[in-house]
Each structure stands twice: as structure tokens, then as C-alpha cells.
A protein has these predicted regions:
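Internal hydrophobic alpha-helix adjacent to the cofactor/substrate pocket in enzyme cavities
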Residues: 379-400
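Conserved N-terminal/central alpha/beta ligand/cofactor-binding core
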Residues: 7, 24-132, 142, 150, ...
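Conserved Rossmann-like nucleotide-cofactor binding loop
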Residues: 18, 41, 594
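Glycine-rich phosphate/pyrophosphate-binding beta-alpha loops
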Residues: 369-377, 433-435
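Beta1/beta-strand and adjacent pyrophosphate-binding region of the FAD-binding site
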Residues: 4-18
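An anion/pyrophosphate-binding glycine-rich loop and adjacent beta-alpha core
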Residues: 39-41, 84, 184-321, 418-491, ...
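A glycine-rich dinucleotide-binding beta-alpha-beta segment and adjacent secondary-structure elements
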Residues: 307-373, 401-414, 533-587, 592
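Extended, charge-enriched "interface" segments that sit outside catalytic cores
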Residues: 431, 437-439, 443, 448-453, ...
């Protein structure tokens, strides 16, 4: 028996990192929103690493925050240790990573959902989805039928989830949760193309069973940089991590039992993440390496569980115990939660458009691992965009479309919907051709005005943003106007920085353009420096040092956006365009790009094909 459970503007299926951002964005935009979770205790769960951010991922977190999302704020509230990665490289790849208290993170996120106006939470498994005119009908296992105008699918690894540990395999979700067993069939009946991916996670072990005596200690960075641009106070480092290594004995235990790995025994059909291989995969693929690094990380302030970063596995439990105990510091380790692999259903993202809406199913959106990506941060970014666009569609407002020249979020989405995926997609700085412009320190400059226009940045935060921008502009002007005389004091500073002294007056901006010189170096002579926050000076220094490169990237962006403005008709049949190669015709008909710029990024479409397309488009527009 079924019953009418009510009408909502937007429904979000899944309350992980994608679902949370989707539901909050939708509700905060004024839409009556319902979010479903199989288990209310799984809201905001971090079933893999107890951390937020990392290379390129930290960029995504700051971008979500700049738009008005929640991940950055909550990560700051739950930080145990913070580190800025890649400081030895240029500012384009500096990325923030925080070790978090995973249980606190889940509690805080759940409470934020509970307190959010316009948002209703439901513990229920959605087993059926069907179209009803302009609405969507969602049916739960208990027979509740929800009528919704838009739906966001954020199912994570729950959809058709299957656990693998050695020869043992069973239907299951992450962290011992129930899987969503019937929704995938309903989506297939609807006509959604699904595929199988897989991921894995390491064991959690008992802190008191680890010998930390000879392990390398990894401390957090000082001063701490928060994820959120709205943070009043930065988080504090309250924990450390440890580093250890595998060895020949570890390798031998794994090789002796590799036939028992479901991955190598042919039990797993799903494709795993290329950039996060299991330890047995590392041993097999990189057999020439004598050892592999692992990080021993705390899971929280009120738990004794420790996470073994870099050691995911699907080998049998007794084999896991054996190879973990070959590692320095883990000789007597006790496993609290064993490592496992999980296989799950996800969609082919080539079915989506730039709003993350399914092209052939108006009002249906995908987000996170359901779209073929991996990672909490990638999920949150997509969840925000999908949830915001679902609400904007209901409200009859213009959609939120972020391009790859303006954000890593735009790069992520463009890669998914244009290039597709053959394995779980992971964000990396190398995926952006505009990474010097898309730095994490300027995410607010790029995206907070968009969040304000959406209605997700309130007056208080907007005033704070404008103040920061005014301070940066004032400091840029001061740097150009301030001239230092060639004094002994100045030249002593320059010599200490291993750069040439000066014989004539020199502008502050010119000194900061030198690679060897920083604001900190110039403190003794820059006596008129205003009392601005540290990030103002860091931002100005980066802008000055990389001015030439940034100008060139801005020129590239202008050209890309010129091509993005050349829209392609939705009804176009590329097979009928004379001059296009067969491969280009097939790829263009499959991806259905919205503009010439996107068409040029499709694998298999050459510059010559784009020239043909531009000629055809010009003639087509003239005929009109």
C-alpha cells in the first residue's frame, strides 16, 4: 500500500557531501526541500579518509564556500590539523588540507540541516522514481509517495552497493550501512544509462596498539589558514599525524595472497579510481618500488580509531592483519574496522548538461559519485551546483553555469559532461589550463559576487567581502606609489635575499615582483605598511609576481569565452554536416555540446572539425 507523503519543490536523494550542499542551496534559495537518507546517522559521513581538502580539492572547498556553501565552514569547526600543501611550488597549486574529527563533522552537518528553514529530513530508502507530467514521483520502501518538481540524485556509493573483502561479497553500503538496492533498476527503466565503478578504504586501527616511538611525526602548519572566507577565527592544530612505510615483508605477504584479492580474482567488475589505488594494486603495478608511504591519522578527538591513509585493500581480513603487522609501528596493531572495496552504480555524465540536469529528463539532476566522480570535495561542489539549479528551475530563474575559466567547479563539471569518465574522476590542478588565475586565495573574488547574485551571501558577509576587496585595491595602489630610496638598509635586505642591490629609487611593487623578495623580507624598511590581514599581502604579492603570466591566461580566457558564446542548435544532426570526420560526427552527436568552445574540448574532435563547425554555423545563422 502507498500513501501521499506530500508535495515539495525539490527532493534530494542522499545526504552525503553532495546531498547536503544540494539540499542547503535549494532550501536557502526559498524552495520547499526534502532530503532522504537511508540512515539518519549517515548524514555527512566521511566513510573513507577523515580529512577535507588536498591538492585541487582544497580549491573546490574554498569555491563552494565563496558561493555560499557549507563544507568549508564545517571543516573549520571540526579541524584537528591543518596543512597547506605544495608550498614548495607556485601559488597556483597551493592547496589547503585539514584533518577533521569525522564524527563531529557528521553531527554538525546534520544539525545544520535540521535547523535549515524550508528543509525537511527523512530517513527512508527511495525505491522508485517516475515522471508524472511536469512533476516527479518518488516512492519509498514503506510506500510513501512524494511529489516533487525537481530531483537531485546524490546516491554516493549506496546505489547498488556491494562490499568485497577477500572471497566474501555481499550487498552493502559504506561503513556497514544498508545499500539502495532497487532505485538503480527504476533509473534504468526510466532510460538513464548506468555503469559500475568501485572504490576502497583502508582499515581503522586502535591507537593504543600502535608503537609511535620511531615513527616520523607530521605536524600542522602555523599560522593556520581557514577554508572559509567568512571565518572569524582560524582553526587550531590539536593533533599530529605519523608517517611509516611498507617493506619487503609487506610486499611478500600481499604477493603470496594476491590470488585472494577480489580485484585480481575477477570478482569485481567495477572500475576503480586511477589515482587512489589499493595497496595490492600499488604492489602489482609498481613492483620496482621497494616501499610505499602511509600516513597514520586520527579519526577524531573522542575516539581511539586511527586511519591508515594509503593502505586501502580488499584482501581477506586475516591477510590484512598479516601485512599491516609487517609495517614499522604496526607490529601489534589491532584492526577495529577492516578495509574493504565497494562497488556501486553511477551514471554516464555525458547525459548531463552544464547545470547537471539530465538533458532528456527535465528537472532531474545528478551530483557527486553518482556522476562518476570521486571525493568528498568533488561531491560537495557538484551538489551545490545541482541543488542551486534545481531550485532556480523551480523558481523560473536563470540557471547557475560555472565555466572552466572561472572556477575549478566549472572545470570539474565541464570535464564530466564533455569528456566523460572511464574511472572515478578526481580533481587535480593539472586539469585546469587556467590554474594561475584559479588560485584558492582568490576564490572569493571570482565567485562571491555570483553567490551574492544568487541570494546565498547575506549583507554582513557581502560587506566583509567588499572591505577585503577595498583593502587589496588600496594595497595594490600603495605598492605602485611607494618608492624606497637606495639606502644601506634596503640593500642589506636585498643582499640577504640573494638579489641585486639598487642604486636608484625603486617602487615597492618592483621589489615584490622579484622572485626572491617577499613582504616579510621588506618589513624593516616598509614602515608605512597598513595593518591589514595576512591574506591581503599574500594576494597582492602573488598578483605582482605573476602579473605577466596572469595577463596571458586572461587573454586565453577571453578567446575561450568568445567560442563559448557561439551557441550550437539543440536539434543539430552532426552527421549531416559535410566536412566533419566520422569520429567527430559520432562524438558530437553523443555529447551534444551547447557551444563551439565545449565542442572543441571533446576527445576526438580536431581543430579542423571546429573550423568546419564554425563555417557551418556562420552559414546556418545567415540562412536564419
Amino acid at each position: 500500500m502507498s500513501y501521499d507523503a506530500g508535495k515539495y519543490d525539490v527532493a534530494v536523494i542522499g545526504a552525503g557531501h553532495a546531498g547536503i550542499e544540494a539540499a542547503l542551496a535549494s532550501a536557502r534559495l526559498g524552495c520547499r526541500t526534502v532530503i532522504f537518507t537511508i540512515n539518519m546517522d549517515a548524514v555527512g559521513n566521511c566513510p573513507c579518509n577523515p580529512s577535507i581538502g588536498g591538492t585541487a580539492k582544497g580549491h573546490l572547498v574554498r569555491e563552494v564556500d565563496a558561493l555560499g556553501g557549507e563544507m568549508g565552514k564545517t571543516a573549520d569547526e571540526c579541524t584537528l590539523q591543518s596543512r597547506m600543501l605544495n608550498l614548495g611550488k607556485g601559488p597556483a597549486v597551493h592547496s589547503l588540507r585539514a584533518q577533521i574529527d569525522r564524527n563531529k563533522y557528521a553531527r554538525v552537518m546534520k544539525h545544520k540541516l535540521e535547523q535549515c528553514e524550508n528543509l525537511v529530513m527523512r530517513q527512508a530508502e527511495v525505491i522508485d522514481i517516475e515522471r508524472d507530467g511536469e512533476n516527479w514521483l518518488l516512492t519509498t520502501r514503506l510506500g510513501a509517495v512524494y511529489t516533487c518538481r525537481a530531483v537531485v540524485l546524490a546516491t554516493g556509493t549506496f546505489l547498488g552497493g556491494r562490499i568485497f573483502v577477500g572471497e566474501v561479497s555481499y550487498a552493502g553500503g559504506p561503513d556497514g550501512m544498508f545499500p539502495a538496492t532497487e532505485l538503480a533498476g527504476s533509473l534504468k527503466e526510466l532510460g538513464i544509462s548506468l555503469r559500475r565503478f568501485k572504490t576502497g578504504t583502508p582499515a581503522r586501527v586502535l591507537r593504543s596498539s600502535i608503537d609511535f616511538t620511531d615513527l616520523e611525526v607530521q605536524k600542522g602548519d602555523e599560522p593556520v589558514t581557514p577554508f572559509s572566507f567568512d571565518a572569524e577565527m582560524p582553526p587550531k592544530n590539536s593533533a599530529v599525524c605519523y608517517v611509516s612505510w611498507t617493506n619487503d615483508r609487506t610486499k611478500q605477504v600481499i604477493l603470496d595472497n594476491i590470488h585472494r584479492s577480489p580485484l585480481y580474482a575477477g570478482m569485481i567488475e567495477g572500475v576503480g579510481p586511477r589515482y587512489c589505488p589499493s595497496i595490492e594494486d600499488k604492489i602489482m603495478r609498481f613492483s620496482e618500488k621497494p616501499r610505499h608511504q602511509l600516513f597514520i591519522e586520527p579519526c577524531g578527538a573522542e575516539t581511539e580509531e586511527m586511519y591508515l591513509q594509503g593502505m586501502s585493500s580488499s584482501l581477506p581480513e586475516e591477510v590484512q592483519i598479516a601485512f599491516y603487522r609487517t609495517i614499522k609501528g604496526l607490529e601489534h596493531v589491532e584492526i577495529m574496522r577492516n578495509a574493504y572495496a565497494i562497488e556501486y552504480d553511477c551514471c554516464d555524465p555525458l547525459q548531463l548538461n552544464a547545470t547537471l540536469e539530465f538533458r532528456d529528463y527535465p528537472g532531474l539532476y545528478g551530483a557527486g559519485q553518482f556522476n562518476g566522480s570521486s571525493g568528498y570535495e568533488e561531491a560537495a561542489a557538484q551538489g551545490f551546483v545541482a541543488g542551486a539549479n534545481a531550485a532556480l528551475k523551480v523558481l523560473n530563474r536563470d540557471p547557475l553555469i560555472l565555466d572552466r575559466a572561472g572556477s575549478y567547479i566549472g572545470t570539474l563539471i565541464d570535464d564530466l559532461i564533455t569528456k566523460g569518465v572511464t574511472d572515478p574522476y578526481r580533481m587535480m590542478t593539472s586539469r585546469s589550463e587556467y590554474r594561475l588565475v584559479l588560485r584558492q586565495d582568490n576564490a572569493d573574488e571570482r565567485l562571491t559576487p555570483i553567490g551574492r547574485k544568487l541570494g546565498l551571501i547575506d549583507d554582513r558577509r557581502w560587506a566583509k567581502f567588499e572591505k577585503k576587496q577595498a583593502q587589496k585595491e588600496a594595497e595594490m595602489k600603495r605598492a605602485e606609489k611607494t618608492v624606497f630610496s637606495p639606502t644601506d638598509a634596503l640593500n642589506e635586505v636585498l643582499v640577504s635575499c640573494e638579489t641585486s642591490p639598487v642604486t636608484t629609487g625603486v617602487r615597492l611593487s618592483e621589489l615584490l615582483r622579484r622572485p626572491q623578495v617577499t613582504y616579510a623580507d621588506l618589513t624593516p624598511i616598509d614602515t608605512e605598511r597598513p595593518d591589514y590581514p595576512r591574506e591581503i599581502f599574500e594576494s597582492v604579492e602573488t598578483a605582482l609576481k605573476y602579473e605577466g603570466y596572469i595577463k596571458r591566461q586572461l587573454q586565453d580566457i577571453a578567446e575561450m569565452r568568445r567560442l563559448e558564446k557561439k551557441l550550437l542548435p539543440k536539434e543539430i544532426n552532426y552527421a549531416e554536416i559535410s566536412g566533419l570526420r566520422l569520429e567527430a560526427q559520432e562524438k558530437l552527436n553523443r555529447v551534444r555540446p551547447e557551444n563551439v568552445g565545449q565542442a572543441g574540448r571533446i576527445s576526438g574532435v580536431s581543430p579542423a572539425d571546429i573550423s568546419v563547425l564554425l563555417i557551418w554555423l556562420s552559414a546556418h545563422n545567415e540562412d536564419k
